[in-house]
C-alpha cells in the first residue's frame, strides 16, 4: 500500500517521523493529497471499507506540528478525508495522549485497521517506540481491524464512555 507524506516543515527535523518514512522508502513525498487523506478533523472514520481506495491510490499523511495546524489547512487538501478512531500515542513526546499520534503512528494504525498488519509491524520496527505504540493500543487496534465505519464508531463511543465514566 502506497503511503504519501505532505510535509509542511513545521516539526523538529530530528523528531520528524514522516521524513524518516520517506528516507527509509516506506513513503513518498508529495505536494498534493492522494487517496485517503488522514485528517484529524474529518467526520468520517477510516475503516476496512476504505481499503480498496487505499490500495488503488494510497494513504496521505500530513506531516506537521500539532500546535500549528488548523482545520482549514486540511480542508484545502483534495481526497477522501478520514480520521483515525481513538488511539493513544506511544511516542515519547505525547505518550498516552489520545488522538495525538505521530505521523508514523498514524501510518501504523491505518495499515492495521485496513488489515495490513504485517506491513504495520514492519514499519513499527523502524522506531524504538514502535512496539510501545502497538502494545499500548493492541486491544483497540484488534477491535478496529477489518471493521466497518459504523462498527468502529460504536467501539470508539464505548471506549470514550469508559474513560469519562458515562453510562
UniProtKB/Swiss-Prot annotation:
Domain of life from the UniProt record: Archaea
Role: Aminocarboxypropyltransferase that catalyzes the aminocarboxypropyl transfer on pseudouridine corresponding to position 914 in M.jannaschii 16S rRNA. It constitutes the last step in biosynthesis of the hypermodified N1-methyl-N3-(3-amino-3-carboxypropyl) pseudouridine (m1acp3-Psi).
GO BP, sorted A to Z: enzyme-directed rRNA pseudouridine synthesis
InterPro entries from the UniProt entry: RNaseL-inhib-like_metal-bd_dom, Tsr3-like, Tsr3_C
GO CC terms in record: cytoplasm
Protein name: 16S rRNA aminocarboxypropyltransferase
Pfam families from the UniProt entry: Fer4_RLI, Ribo_biogen_C
GO molecular function: 18S rRNA aminocarboxypropyltransferase activity; S-adenosyl-L-methionine binding
Keywords attached to this entry: Cytoplasm, Ribosome biogenesis, rRNA processing, S-adenosyl-L-methionine, Transferase
E.C. code: 2.5.1.157
Organism in which the protein naturally occurs: Sulfurisphaera tokodaii (strain DSM 16993 / JCM 10545 / NBRC 100140 / 7) (Sulfolobus tokodaii)
Family: Belongs to the TDD superfamily. TSR3 family.
Catalytic reaction annotation: an N(1)-methylpseudouridine in rRNA + S-adenosyl-L-methionine = N(1)-methyl-N(3)-[(3S)-3-amino-3-carboxypropyl]pseudouridine in rRNA + S-methyl-5'-thioadenosine + H(+)
PANTHER family per UniProt: 18S RRNA AMINOCARBOXYPROPYLTRANSFERASE (PTHR20426:SF0), RIBOSOME BIOGENESIS PROTEIN TSR3 HOMOLOG (PTHR20426)
Chief place where the protein resides: cytoplasm
Binding residues for S-adenosyl-L-methionine: 17, 62, 84, 99, 103
Amino acid at each position: 500500500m502506497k503511503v504519501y507524506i505532505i510535509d509542511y516543515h513545521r516539526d523538529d527535523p530530528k523528531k520528524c517521523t514522516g521524513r524518516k518514512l520517506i528516507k527509509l522508502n516506506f513513503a513518498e513525498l508529495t505536494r498534493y493529497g492522494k487517496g485517503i487523506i488522514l485528517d484529524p478533523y474529518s467526520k468520517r472514520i477510516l475503516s476496512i471499507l476504505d481499503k480498496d481506495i487505499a490500495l488503488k491510490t494510497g494513504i496521505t499523511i500530513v506531516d506537521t506540528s500539532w500546535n500549528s495546524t488548523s482545520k482549514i489547512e486540511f480542508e484545502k487538501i483534495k481526497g477522501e478525508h478520514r480520521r483515525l478512531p481513538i488511539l493513544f500515542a506511544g511516542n515519547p513526546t505525547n505518550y498516552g495522549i489520545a488522538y495525538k499520534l505521530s505521523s508514523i503512528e498514524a501510518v501504523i494504525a491505518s495499515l492495521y485497521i485496513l488489515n495490513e498488519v504485517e506491513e504495520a509491524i514492519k514499519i513499527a520496527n523502524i522506531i524504538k517506540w514502535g512496539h510501545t505504540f502497538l502494545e499500548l493500543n493492541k486491544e483497540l487496534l484488534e477491535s478496529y481491524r477489518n471493521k466497518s465505519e459504523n462498527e468502529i464508531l460504536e467501539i470508539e463511543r464505548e471506549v470514550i464512555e469508559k474513560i469519562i465514566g458515562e453510562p
